[in-house]
Amino acid sequence: MSQILTGRQAEELHKSLIAYLSSINASQSVTTLREELQIGDNFTDAACKKYEGFLEKKWISVVRLQKRILDLESKIASLQAELDSAPTITSRANRDPKSWLPGTSPTHTLGSHRGAITCVAFHPVFSSLASGSEDYSIKIWDWELGELERTLKGHTRTVTGLDFGGQKGRTLLASCSNDLTIKLWDPSNDYANIRTLFGHDHSVSSVRFLIPGGNILISASRDTTLRMWDTSTGFCVKTIHTQGDWVRDVFPSFDGKWLVSGGRDQAATIWEVSSGEARASLLGHENYIECCTFAPPSSYGYLATLAGLKKPPSTNSSAEFVATGARDKTVKLWDSRGSLIKTLIGHNNWVRGLVFHPGGKYLFSVGDDKTIRCWDLSQEGKLVKTLEGAHEHFVSCIQWAPDPANLVQSSVAERPEGNKGTEHGTTGFRCVIATGSADSCVRVFM
């Protein structure tokens, strides 16, 4: 008798072996096994039928359990590594915000939408967070309290993009949609829809204010154009014909002098705002580009090292480095000339959103693999943290809460040339991110 199994368990195993051999017509082996195990004729064919499939089920269960054990061991190792690198209790209160990474559990899960979340945006001053959805609505939340404040209705198709901006003391919320329109909402007047902008000939994919304190709005569309709008008049003041395909995303440099766009043609392009001309094409992705962003000056030192530069660019210069995410499951880092610096591999599905840590050391990405991934630029873009199951479905967007003090950057173009670049080196900021998902929820990590 086995030293591991009890007498009853051993008997069950022996009968299962006989049942399995009988099912594959190994009659000689059955006879031999009956003799060896002293199982007589009282174990009839009818009784044998009860044990058919028992051994196979046990085998499959063992394989599944082994896989589950390996997965759990991997997660334990990852969590242990995270724990080992975490600050001690005594130092946590004095932790440098530049090293902040989101915890595994969200502070708030905001649920009210009836469709997938496509975009989120933070108010630049107040604790308000806007979310857009495939249910055609925009919802305004208090991200500190985790409460719904109001629902905005007006679009007749999926809301695809959101951004807060506008002149000082006159913050507006801009939204864009597959209904071909851009709408402006006034937070100071109960988010009244004060203007609707018409001009695009197809779905509007993305909308951004050119600079935080300005009145120029940038939009990207499936009609292959980028348009600039004066929000004070509602007029389109410039159109850039990309000569490409569906433009999925657009992002301005911090000084409003440059744009980066990306889309279905698998290329990202850096544009000069004043002339509307392309400065560089970033070629290398093998599928649609879903998201693109300029690196903040606080990242220049890390990215310059990755690029092999002897010294980083001045923090007064803009559009020096770009990050893109695509349906080819990769994140790519580029310099302003269009040279590929690094490809970050880790996602196992489409990459849908990117945001740089204000401290400059990290880049966060989200994707259809339901994860938030944190890449350490000081370690050559090493993946240092993965929030598995950040949502229950595809993670479609991510945003970092802006620091109200950084609104002074909007006047950067008016600064004297002699001003030092430390004005862009963020020393204090709010450690808050928000993500949206196809599970119809927004999650806030603090």
UniProtKB/Swiss-Prot annotation:
GO biological process entries: cell division; establishment of mitotic spindle orientation; microtubule sliding
Residue ranges annotated for the LisH domain, each copy included: 9-41
InterPro entries: Dynein_regulator_LIS1, G-protein_beta_WD-40_rep, LIS1_N, PAC1-like_LisH-like_dom, WD40/YVTN_repeat-like_dom_sf, WD40_repeat_CS, WD40_repeat_dom_sf, WD40_rpt
Location(s) in or outside the cell: Cytoplasm, Cytoskeleton; Cytoplasm, Cytoskeleton, Spindle pole
Recorded coiled-coil stretches: 60-86
Keywords: Cell cycle, Cell division, Coiled coil, Cytoplasm, Cytoskeleton, Microtubule, Mitosis, Repeat, Transport, WD repeat
GO cellular component terms listed in the entry, alphabetical order: cytoplasm; microtubule; microtubule associated complex; spindle pole
Gene Ontology MF terms: dynein complex binding
PROSITE patterns: WD_REPEATS_1, WD_REPEATS_2, WD_REPEATS_REGION
Xref: Pfam families: LisH_PAC1, WD40
WD-type repeats, residues: 112-153, 155-195, 199-239, 242-281, 284-344, 346-385, 390-430, 432-446
Subunit structure, interactors included: Self-associates. Interacts with NDL1 and dynein.
Domain comment as written in the entry: Dimerization mediated by the LisH domain may be required to activate dynein.
Stated family: Belongs to the WD repeat LIS1/nudF family.
Function: Positively regulates the activity of the minus-end directed microtubule motor protein dynein. May enhance dynein-mediated microtubule sliding by targeting dynein to the microtubule plus end. Required for nuclear migration during vegetative growth as well as development. Required for retrograde early endosome (EE) transport from the hyphal tip. Required for localization of dynein to the mitotic spindle poles. Recruits additional proteins to the dynein complex at SPBs.
Protein name: Nuclear distribution protein PAC1-1
Organism (species): Uncinocarpus reesii (strain UAMH 1704)
Gene that this sequence comes from: PAC1-1
